Amino acid sequence: MNQVQAFEQSMIPETAVPKFGAGDTLKVHVKVVEGTRERIQVFEGVCIGRMNAGLRSTFTVRKISFGEGVERTFPVYSPRVDKIEVIRHGDVRRAKLYYLRGRTGKASRIKEKRDW
């Protein structure tokens, strides 16, 4: 491990990030600053992809808002991300669900993963 990797590893916070992946429905609590006030805004949707790159890890969440698709990419270890909740685990066979961008309504549903 070189010095850059060691430094990045030491900078990763000890906060517990839940295990999630593509297909999971997430609630992301984001800190939003409006003027002098700061509040928590919740963004709920399906995780369509995750990039694991140590401190620079990100994930993308997609939801349909008023008939329009909205995607947001969040850094996993950002101080702006207050909390990540996993609502349900989806059963998918792909790591990136970019094909959901062309689907709406029932066609964009994802089966729930069951642990029997």
From Swiss-Prot:
Q: Which GO terms describe its molecular function?
A: structural constituent of ribosome
Q: Which UniProt keywords apply?
A: Ribonucleoprotein, Ribosomal protein
Q: Which SUPFAM superfamilies match?
A: Translation proteins SH3-like domain (SSF50104)
Per its UniProt record, what InterPro entries does this chain match?
A: Ribosomal_bL19, Ribosomal_bL19_CS, Ribosomal_bL19_sf, Translation_prot_SH3-like_sf
GO CC annotations, alphabetized: cytosolic large ribosomal subunit
Any matching Pfam family: Ribosomal_L19
Keyword Lipoprotein attributed: no
Q: Does the keyword Phosphoprotein apply?
A: no
A GO biological process this protein is involved in? translation
Q: What does this protein do?
A: This protein is located at the 30S-50S ribosomal subunit interface and may play a role in the structure and function of the aminoacyl-tRNA binding site.
What does the sequence similarity comment in the record state about its family?
A: Belongs to the bacterial ribosomal protein bL19 family.
Which NCBIfam families does this one have? rplS_bact
Put simply, this protein is called Large ribosomal subunit protein bL19
Which species is this record about?
Magnetococcus marinus (strain ATCC BAA-1437 / JCM 17883 / MC-1)
Source gene? rplS
